[in-house]
Amino acid sequence: LFEDEEVAKEINDKFIAIKVDREERPDVDAVYMKVCQRMNGHGGWPLSVFMTPDQIPFYAGTYFPKESKHGLPGIKQVIGYLAETYHNDPKQIEDVTESVKKSLNQVIFKKGEERVTKEAVDQAFHELGKTFDTLHGGFEGAPKFPAPHNLMFLLRYYQQTGKLMARQMVEKTLNSMAKGGLYDHIGFGFTRYSTDEEWLVPHFEKMLYDQALLLIAYTEAYQLTGNEFYKTISEQVIEFVNREMRSPEGAFYSAIDADSEGKEGAYYVWGKGEVERILGDELAELYTTTYNITTEGNFEGKNIPNLINTHFDTVA
């Protein structure tokens, strides 16, 4: 439905849409899944939750067809009804939100008075250590997400405790992501996640929130380490976002689709012959050697430029 222009227009005309990746933010997913279960008696995905500006849910549901059918309300009808009710019958919305708050107060909305303990922070560090990929960086196996919030936590943990392992996990991950195919070495910017453990083959979609959070992670790492590589990546991400994701009105697009020319990633992959025709023999030799571009390719007969097997001291 996100790709349906008619539905997208309905949503954008009547609501502010926020898309959350439940694989990257299972904590957010868990909260609103409880909302859906409490309101409907069941949950599932895809999950849609409609909220007031102060973030109190007043409607939740899972799958909606485009038009109403087989007893299921269509997403267009749901959007229209909720928008009309919100504007014309605010008392009904208020009654629902009050009921939701009372029902969920104990499990979601109640603010805890206890501070996060040192033991809890240490435990979080140890849990990340258990899942850390010492060979390629990152956490757990494929598909592998950047999870910049983990890296920012580890940077702060290192600053407070001096535990070198925390810093090493961050640096290994940042280096591997920026050298791999997860990063666009031509147009810059990070793709959404890697389909393999070594960050080579990405899902080619580029998300605005990934650029923002990874920019924070790389700039904070630069501040801590003084590593110019992190500064370069940060500057390139800013350049990419301003060039490709800023709208003419001055706002930002939320994502760039993975598909082009009828298939995923076609825009981002290269044949060795293409590189040679564009750059000429001398420059092409340097580029293909540096970015591991071969005749056989590393992705469906084409190449995802990467620096995985390249040592920086040989590039300059």
Residue ranges of model-derived segments:
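Replace the tail clause
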Residues: 1-316
